[in-house]
Amino acid sequence: AIAQLVENEFYLTLDADVICLKPLDESKLIIDGKALLQYEQRAQHPKWWKSSARILKMSPDVGPKDLGMTVTPALMSRTLSQKLMQELSPNKAGENWVDALCSLHDPANPRNWWIGRFLKLKWTEYSLYYLCAMKLGLLEQYHVIAGTSQTPALLLIHDSHPYESWNIAGSFDAANPGLFCVVGSKTRLPPKEVWQKVAPYIQGSAEQPPL
């Protein structure tokens, strides 16, 4: 929904457990007018891709085999997001794309007692976004793939897993292609503990301890 409000063509999505590894500016995130997009194996979350393809009434077998985009941190195009909203909008008067998605999760709605509706439940905004871009043939117009020889930067690296053996200095090294890493909230680690480990590598961090 934020795509209806932002003025820039691209916007960055973040979660609270994402850590920025180096100073950033637009030139590191947007290359020749196209935003970085990073692949991951669809096998990590196969239901996302199947459910999203069903919602968009398309085959999930598009693009590089077995690959889809990562989730946060992610760069998204306002134009592509708006086109996704149009694709999701029902033809029925008085309903919009929000209704179309949220109604799938209402157990009291008799329509959801049909197996076909149940099989659409596991969507995410990222799988919908990527598949819609592929359906419309617009992905390459707005995105460049991260982690290639031409564009070595990575939006996300996984050096922080497992946390106990994390080489923090290596993650923050200027030569590391990673722009962000994640210390997942599901680890249940106290934020203060994580902060104490990363603070020495973040300029001015001593003045900004976490709550």
What function would you assign to each model-found segment?
Residues I19-P23, K28-L29, Y126, L189-P191:
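Short catalytic/ligand-binding loop motif for oxyanion handling, primarily in non-cytosolic enzymes
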